[in-house]
Structure formats: C-alpha cells, structure tokens
A protein has these predicted regions:
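Metal-cofactor-dependent catalytic cores
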Residues: 1-264
Length: 264
C-alpha cells in the first residue's frame, strides 16, 4: 500500500466532553496534548469512572461546544441547556441518566478509568483502562486522522450502512484527491504509520492504525444502531479505520492546510 506524500485538511473536529457529540471547527490550536478543548471534560461517576459511549450509549445523545471563555456549553437530548460553570450541571446530568454524576475538567496530574465493552456482539465482555493525564482520551495518542477515501472504501464493503464521519470521531479529515492521484483505493493513510507528517506547520508522529470498537455501532442523533458497521470493518480492514498521531510541537491548523510526509 502506498499513499501520496500530500493531502488536504477538509474537516476539523473536537469533542469537548468525552463521548458527547462534538463540534466542527475551521481552525484550532494543538500541541502534544491534542486539540485545545478536545476531551478536556468528562462525566464522572462516584467510583471515579468517566462515562464513555462504549458502556453508556445514551451519552452520545448530548452535544457540547467550547465557548470563547474556555467553558463548555452542553445540550441534553430533551433540549435542556447547561454549561461547565453552571452550578446545576451535575444535577441535570444525574437526572438525565438517572445516576449520581458530575462533570469534571481533567487535570494534568490525575487519571480516570473507563469501562469498555470489548465485544460488540457480547455486552458481558468488558475491560477497564485508564485515561492519560490531562484529557479523557482512550489512547496515549492525542489526534485521530481519517481520510475520506477510507470512508468510501469502508462504505463499498457495506453499502447499506450509514458511514457518517460522526461514527468515527476523528479530529482531522483529509482528502487525497488531486490531479495526480485517485484516492478510491482506501485505507492509504495507514502507509504513514511510523513516519512524521506535518499538519500545516505542526509536525506529528503517526503512531499506529486506529482499531475500532463498539462505539462505531452506537445509535446517535441521525444515525441508527448498526452492528454490521463493525463487522464489515473487521472483514475489510482488520477492524481498523484511520490513524493516530501525536503532535511534536505546538501550533495552529486550519481547514485547507496541507498534510505532508516529512523527510525521514
């Protein structure tokens, strides 16, 4: 598999609250800890577990967006709005999901546990893992990149599926399309694993492919629950879709910026 040396950023996403719907942005600052405002808040249980759509699918029904002051606006499925600095936010979240909960901003010196359903076909198969300090990521990699060509390739393998980018929660969506390359092969960004790429002017190490899980099958606004999404990815690409990166410096990137492989 080969990938062209360049692509174009066509979408940027961040997810201010772990497993809630994210927001599409045109420009964002980032560093080794990821996008500014990405997964910096989580909904936490009294036992110290942060809720994830892997084990609590209902949380995907809420949405979150970062305000100019750094606080987060939250809209719950029944239309109630709250915010990270609202004294009532914990009680509203608890009432919505019918359990004691609190909204928590991640600190650089603390970690939380995530309860993970490991098998989309069997909800009894689970494991727990810890988040990295300072954010509620599932991985030590802090930026997720996905190409439009990979989405198209996945959809060809299962044409009846809703292959909406929101199922896969990328930070960066790229297009390889140009006059010299037809990107319909799919999954070509995986050829960048182990290399350093530049997102605009920001260098980032491509650490690994993104292995998918039950999250891809969950229902969310406008998308149905669909186990065949995951089953199809297992057959077509060993359950992988996209790549994980870690920025090696700080900077700002924008839609329209070029992504290119740096000299190794």
């Amino acid at each position: 598999m080969t990938a062209p040396a360049e692509a174009t950023i066509v979408e940027l996403w961040r997810y201010p609250v772990k497993s809630m719907q994210g927001e599409r942005v045109t420009r964002v600052a980032l560093d080794a800890s990821g996008f500014t405002g990405d997964r910096r808040f989580g909904v936490v249980t009294p036992e110290g577990f942060v809720l994830s759509g892997k084990s609590e699918p209902r949380i995907l029904g809420a949405s979150a967006a970062v305000r100019a002051d750094g606080e987060v606006e939250i809209e719950l499925p029944h239309g109630v709005r709250t915010a990270s600095n609202d004294p009532a936010v914990d009680s509203l979240l608890s009432a919505w999901l019918d359990r004691p909960l609190r909204l928590h901003r991640a600190a650089t010196d603390e970690q939380f546990m995530i309860h993970h359903q490991t098998d989309p076909e069997d909800e009894t198969k689970t494991k727990d893992f810890s988040t990295p300090p300072g954010a509620y990521y599932d991985s030590r990699s802090t930026v997720h990149l996905l190409s439009q060509s990979s989405l198209r390739a996945a959809s060809r393998a299962y044409g009846d599926g809703q292959w909406d980018v929101r199922r896969f929660r990328p930070n960066v969506v790229i297009s390889f399309r140009n006059g010299a390359f037809d990107d319909d092969e799919g999954f070509v960004e995986e050829a960048w694993v182990g290399k350093t790429v530049a997102l605009g002017d920001v260098p980032a190490l491509v650490r690994k492919r993104t292995e998918r899980c039950v999250m891809t099958t969950r229902a969310q606004p406008g998308l149905d629950r669909d186990l065949q999404i995951y089953r199809s990815l297992v057959k077509s690409n060993h359950a992988n879709l996209g790549i994980y990166l870690v920025p090696q410096a700080g900077g700002t990137i924008a839609v329209g910026d070029i992504v290119k492989v740096l000299a190794q």
